[in-house]
């Protein structure tokens, strides 16, 4: 059994890095391991790869979508710690922590995503936890434990997944409970005092009930230090847990699964590294990019996220299954963000994010010999409250306010979303080799926003435990409502000449919801009605409003295998036209034109048009087999992505004139080339199996914002990872050693660029060779870096 299962296990790992399970069983992995002979495993390899990209279980070779899937053992053997780790080996995908946080996710697929996590902006990539859509990116950096698989769907998924999947979707699927008693303990220790423990328990309660729970303690020392506050920077301090109860009838026709999860992140604030000396204080640039001098301590950083879910699947007949997905979620984040990363109170931003959501989805699935599909209904009600100060104490004296008065602005954006949709998608097999799929979704989106912005003295504000008071009347006191509706179809044609070959072409639409910029400043509203005086409500409404972003996407692909699945491949080409592209921006405000930036505002525009086109390849080859005994093998996996992403129209008002800035703007967080290569080996050693792998990944130059920044943009770089895992006693015991970023590469993942630039070209404005601040007086140009070299040992015991 051990010798047979080694091949299935490593193939599952190879699929992670190559074909997203094309080359190995992911969902069927456990079945393969139950076989006692190598031929049984090979048969399982050939046809047991299951994903749920189209909201129903299907063999990956039958799915006309670009999908990459990561199984639980594959994630373990690669040393993956959280959901961001899969970005290195998925083509045309960027997944990272959002700037100054450990837990807020920034995800981009094929050039589409969300940089700014402020409530009111919609993500372009949908994140799903057990089929529940996470409406906000806070607390969406999901740690990897108790997981069955992660699926990455590239390209618009508007028909089956709805709004805000215009770039794609990432599905995190937790593990179903086993039929027998199981207890498991995993412990990890590594560099930077990384210490982790995960304890899982599953208990059958009679013939039809099961209970399971997992608890995780995830901690790590800082990669650097806050030299001002005397605390660690980039540390990790997380407690998390999940529990579930399952009811399943003996005939398997009814399954009810109720689950809950809780995460508490008590990590220190993650503060950035200054890229230029302080313009006012003269503070030098620090040598260690993970060190900081940030001084803001209000509010005390604390992040909690929790939720309840109930999934019901009832088989009504041989052809019909009814599925219900109910969920409630809430998260609360208190974050002190020091934009300038100095002890000086120059651009300090205490912030809170409160999010809650309730959702209900119903699906009726139909299955027959030639027609398969589903119809469904989805409802979501969500609220996102974002409040923050922008403390500009050093700017105060320039406008007659003493330095110690802590001048600045308070902003509150309260956004309520109510959306519902109805959808259907069916596939008809005209012959054994020709299938046509068609689907459509109707979505009605209702948004209500309440936005308050006021100059204040004595910051922080009372919302953060301070004593700030308004200085004059509020700058913004706005309430607005808007409704949007959209039909999003999808059509595909699939040709399957053989069981191991799929050729497909598809057309789909997607959209990202509109709304109002929750950081808007009414005092910079353009005069569009020709009436002198303060702006009217209609002018403010139009200025704050941004329309939905839409896409028409075309894709062709081929998936297949050769030589008894010794070589597998997936090739995809795509072309996408975007209209009303949403560009959220943060700018310093000089309301009276005196050259002093005395405020901060968000300005979101529908820039115009963009075109993205590219290709993706995922390959896997078993280059040697049974060379050192049954089950031994050497494998080579590779991924590659190329994308040509450009704005074709980017309209802005420059000097009162509409100007097309497309030649001077780029697509953020979208490197032109991404690639990875993994060499793997499986060997029977003593009483167990040894699996080893080495992965080299590459990303070309990355522009972090639409405006190129020579200080912040990241040149091309490579990362080297490796792992060795040994399992024995029928997989009851395992021990592994893993290394991430073994060459200790320093690379920027995000930052804050509050420096003055030419309005048209975006070239930084310099004074004596140094960038001129556009907010505050120090020059807030700070960067956040990817993790340095980490090496850790992990052991698992199953009882």
Language-model-detected regions and their locations in the chain:
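Gram-negative outer-membrane beta-barrel transporters
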Residues: 372, 432, 436, 566-578, ...
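N-terminal Sec signal peptide and the immediately downstream disordered periplasmic leader
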Residues: 1-78, 83-90, 202, 256, ...
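Short loop/turn motifs that connect adjacent beta-strands in outer-membrane beta-barrel proteins
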Residues: 118-121, 177-182, 205-209, 250-253, ...
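C-terminal beta-signal and adjacent terminal beta-strands/loops
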Residues: 697-705, 726-799
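Periplasmic-side early beta-strands and strand-to-turn transitions of outer-membrane beta-barrels
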Residues: 178-180, 188, 200-297, 331-345, ...
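Outer-membrane beta-barrel translocator/receptor signature
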Residues: 122-124, 136, 145-154, 159-227, ...
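Acidic, small-polar-rich N-terminal luminal/periplasmic segments of exported/outer-membrane proteins
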Residues: 44-180, 556
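Membrane-embedded beta-barrel scaffold of Gram-negative outer-membrane proteins
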Residues: 311-315, 321-337, 496, 502-508, ...
């Amino acid at each position: 059994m051990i010798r047979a299962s080694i091949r299935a296990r490593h193939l599952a790992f190879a699929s992670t890095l190559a074909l997203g399970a094309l080359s190995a069983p992911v969902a069927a992995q456990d079945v393969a391991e139950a076989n006692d002979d190598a031929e049984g495993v090979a048969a399982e390899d050939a046809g047991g790869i299951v994903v749920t990209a189209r909201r129903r279980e299907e063999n990956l070779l039958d799915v006309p979508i670009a999908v990459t899937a990561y199984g639980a053992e594959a994630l373990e053997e690669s040393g993956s710690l959280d959901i961001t780790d899969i970005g290195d080996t998925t083509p045309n995908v960027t997944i990272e922590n959002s700037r100054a946080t450990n837990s807020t996710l920034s995800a981009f697929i094929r050039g589409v995503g969300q940089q700014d996590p402020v409530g009111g902006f919609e993500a372009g990539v949908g994140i799903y936890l057990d089929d529940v859509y996470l409406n906000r990116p806070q607390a969406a950096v999901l740690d990897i434990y108790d997981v069955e698989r992660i699926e990455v769907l590239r390209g618009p998924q508007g028909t089956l997944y709805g709004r805000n999947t215009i770039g794609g979707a990432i599905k995190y699927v937790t593990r179903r409970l086993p039929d027998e008693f199981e207890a498991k303990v995993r412990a990890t220790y590594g560099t930077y005092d990384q210490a982790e423990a995960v304890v899982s328990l599953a208990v059958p309660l009679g013939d039809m009930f099961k209970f399971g729970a997992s608890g995780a303690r995830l901690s790590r020392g800082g990669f650097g230090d806050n030299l001002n506050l005397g605390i660690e920077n980039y540390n990790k301090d997380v407690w998390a847990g999940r529990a579930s109860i399952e009811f399943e009838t003996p005939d398997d026709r009814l399954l009810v699964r109720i689950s809950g999860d809780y995460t508490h992140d008590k990590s220190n604030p993650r503060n950035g590294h200054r890229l230029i000396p302080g313009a006012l204080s003269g503070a030098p640039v620090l040598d260690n990019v993970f060190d900081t001098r940030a001084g803001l301590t209000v509010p005390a950083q604390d992040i909690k996220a929790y939720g309840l879910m109930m999934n019901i699947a009832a088989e009504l007949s041989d052809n019909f299954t009814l599925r219900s997905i109910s969920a409630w979620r809430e998260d609360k984040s208190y974050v002190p963000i020091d934009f300038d990363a100095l002890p000086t109170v120059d651009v300090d931003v205490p912030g809170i994010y409160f999010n809650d959501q309730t959702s209900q989805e119903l699906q009726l699935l139909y299955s027959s010999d030639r027609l398969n599909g589903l119809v469904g209904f989805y409802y979501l009600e969500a609220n996102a409250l974002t409040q923050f100060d922008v403390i500009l104490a050093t700017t105060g004296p320039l406008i007659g306010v003493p330095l110690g008065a802590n001048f600045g602005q308070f902003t509150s954006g309260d956004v309520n979303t109510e959306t519902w949709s109805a959808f259907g998608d069916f596939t008809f097999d005209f012959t054994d080799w020709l299938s046509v799929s068609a689907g459509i979704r109707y979505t009605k989106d209702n948004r209500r926003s309440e936005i308050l912005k006021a100059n204040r003295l004595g910051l922080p504000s009372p919302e953060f435990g301070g004593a700030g008071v308004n200085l004059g009347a509020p700058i913004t006191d706005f309430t607005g409502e808007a409704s949007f509706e959209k039909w999003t179809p999808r059509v595909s044609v699939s040709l399957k000449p053989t069981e191991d070959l799929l050729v497909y072409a598809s057309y789909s639409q997607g959209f990202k919801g509109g709304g109002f910029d929750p950081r808007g400043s009414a005092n910079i509203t353009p005069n569009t009605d020709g009436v002198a005086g303060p702006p009217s409500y209609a002018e403010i409404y139009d200025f704050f409003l941004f329309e939905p972003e839409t896409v028409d996407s075309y894709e062709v692909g081929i998936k297949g295998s050769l030589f008894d699945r010794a070589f597998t491949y997936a090739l995809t080409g795509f072309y996408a036209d975007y209209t009303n592209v949403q560009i959220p921006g943060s700018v310093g405000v000089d309301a009276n034109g005196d050259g002093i930036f005395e405020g901060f505002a968000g300005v979101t525009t529908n820039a115009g048009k963009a075109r993205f086109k590219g290709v993706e390849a995922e390959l896997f080859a078993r280059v040697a087999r049974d060379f050192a005994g049954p089950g031994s093998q050497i494998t080579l996996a590779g991924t590659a992505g190329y994308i040509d992403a450009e704005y074709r129209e980017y309209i802005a008002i420059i000097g009162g004139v509409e100007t097309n800035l497309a030649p001077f703007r780029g697509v953020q967080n979208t490197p032109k080339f991404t690639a990875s290569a993994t060499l793997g080996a499986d060997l029977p050693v003593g009483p167990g199996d040894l699996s080893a792998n080495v992965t080299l990944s590459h990303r070309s130059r990355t522009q972090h914002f639409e405006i190129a920044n020579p200080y912040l943009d990241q040149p091309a770089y490579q990362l080297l990872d490796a792992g060795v895992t040994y399992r024995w006693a029928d997989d009851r015991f395992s021990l592994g050693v893993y290394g991430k970023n073994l060459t200790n590469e320093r690379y920027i993942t995000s930052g804050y660029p509050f420096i003055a630039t030419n309005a048209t070209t975006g070239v930084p404005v310099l004074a004596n060779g140094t960038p001129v601040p556009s907010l505050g007086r120090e020059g807030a140009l700070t960067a956040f870096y990817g993790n340095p070299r980490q090496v850790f040992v992990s052991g698992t015991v199953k009882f």
